[in-house]
């Protein structure tokens, strides 16, 4: 059962049109955009389709408009996940915003999970189950009305303009054949651009959706790097480290104006500091060596300046210290 799906799984490469076709066929809806399912009601019914009786459909609100109402639907979904021991994290704060990319990713996961449970087989009475929900009947009516309007618009489409044979048929009825032919030809040519202009609309919608998804991905990447920079800024504001030269250089780079190249300048500024610290370490080592040599010279000089009596006294002290405690010097 696919509860944990990686971002590189094939589930996240399922297209938007395939997701919409799956939702509409399973739940007998007529969604045109994936983000229309951001209220969470569709997710709850999809779980009900693969786990009948697990979802309390009377708590699901298909007429949810505000974020508060949507969050209640996601609470129902989270309870179902907990009951089924599904560990998938639901990013409610992002889904209720209706952003296309977030809703598409979560719906891709839903499809992968549902297919892993029922193998893609659908034997579900969506209309009957949805009637128990708040706004379920209205959602069914809206879907039916949308489907009916689509059928009527396709059936009532005007016929295409007649061919040039029809134009020739009316030519004998006019005295000024040249004028009538030119006006008919102009009308025929003017109708072509309008027909061409009405065709690319779905293509533009598809392109707009792709651009929205791309913008969402860029925003997520921007937020990721901004959080990293914010962590660096918090670290630089630590009282224990903010006085360090390196931290000061990092701050100047963070707060530099747009177009201001401070990276190279800060690198040159830090180089003498590093060299100076190395020189200080070397000088300390040399001074310690010199001090040790001076101390040795002083000790040798002190020994050489002793008188013969002091040397004999020192020698007798040594002998006494090495003899028995009962002996006296």
UniProtKB/Swiss-Prot annotation:
GO molecular function: microtubule binding
Entry keyword annotation includes Nucleotide-binding: no
SUPFAM superfamilies according to UniProt: Calponin-homology domain, CH-domain, EB1 dimerisation domain-like
Chain residue ranges for the region called Required for nuclear localization: 289-311
CDD domains in the cross-refs: CH_SF (cd00014)
Protein localization: Nucleus; Cytoplasm, Cytoskeleton, Spindle; Cytoplasm, Cytoskeleton, Phragmoplast
Sequence segments annotated as region (Disordered): 130-203
Coiled-coil segments: none
Basic and acidic residues biased stretches: 130-141
GO cellular component, one term: spindle
Entry keywords, A to Z: Cell cycle, Cell division, Cytoplasm, Cytoskeleton, Microtubule, Mitosis, Nucleus
Miscellaneous notes: Plant microtubules behave differently from those of other eukaryotes in mitosis: they lack centrosomes and spindles are barrel-shaped with unfocused poles and no astral microtubules.
Domain writeup: Composed of two functionally independent domains. The N-terminal domain forms a hydrophobic cleft involved in microtubule binding and the C-terminal is involved in protein binding. In Arabidopsis thaliana, EB1A and EB1B possess an acidic C-terminal tail that has autoinhibitory function, but EB1C has a tail region with patches of basic amino acid residues required for nuclear targeting.
Protein name: Microtubule-associated protein RP/EB family member 1C
Biological classification of the source: Eukaryota, Viridiplantae, Streptophyta, Embryophyta, Tracheophyta
């Amino acid at each position: 059962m696919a509860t944990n799906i990686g971002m590189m799984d094939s589930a996240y490469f399922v297209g938007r049109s395939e997701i919409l076709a799956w939702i509409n066929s399973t739940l007998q809806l007529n969604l045109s955009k994936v983000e229309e399912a951001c209220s969470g009601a569709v997710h709850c019914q999809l779980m009900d389709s693969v786990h009948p009786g697990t979802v309390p459909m009377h708590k699901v609100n298909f007429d949810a408009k505000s974020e508060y109402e949507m969050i209640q639907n996601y609470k129902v979904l989270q309870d179902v996940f907990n009951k089924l021991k599904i560990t998938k994290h639901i990013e409610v704060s992002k889904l209720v915003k209706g952003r296309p990319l977030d809703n598409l990713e979560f719906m891709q996961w839903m499809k992968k999970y549902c297919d892993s449970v029922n193998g893609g087989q659908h034997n579900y009475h969506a209309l009957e189950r949805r009637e128990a929900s708040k706004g379920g009947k209205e959602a069914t009516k809206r879907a039916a009305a949308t489907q009916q309007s689509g059928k009527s618009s396709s059936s009532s489409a005007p016929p295409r303009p007649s061919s040039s044979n029809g134009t020739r048929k009316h030519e004998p009825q006019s005295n000024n054949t040249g004028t009538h032919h030119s006006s008919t030809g102009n009308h025929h040519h003017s109708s072509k651009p309008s027909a061409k202009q009405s065709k690319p609309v779905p293509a533009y919608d598809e392109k707009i959706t792709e651009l929205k998804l791309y913008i969402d991905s860029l925003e997520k990447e921007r937020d990721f790097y901004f959080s990293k920079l914010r962590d660096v800024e918090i670290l630089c504001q630590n009282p224990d480290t903010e006085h360090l030269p390196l931290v000061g250089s990092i701050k100047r780079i963070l707060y530099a104006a747009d177009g201001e190249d401070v990276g190279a300048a800060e690198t040159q500024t830090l180089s003498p500091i590093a060299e100076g610290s190395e020189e200080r370490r070397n000088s300390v080592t040399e001074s310690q060596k010199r001090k040790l040599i001076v101390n040795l010279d002083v000790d040798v000089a002190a020994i050489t300046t002793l008188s013969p009596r002091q040397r004999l006294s020192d020698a007798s002290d040594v002998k006494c210290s090495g003899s028995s405690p009962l002996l006296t010097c």
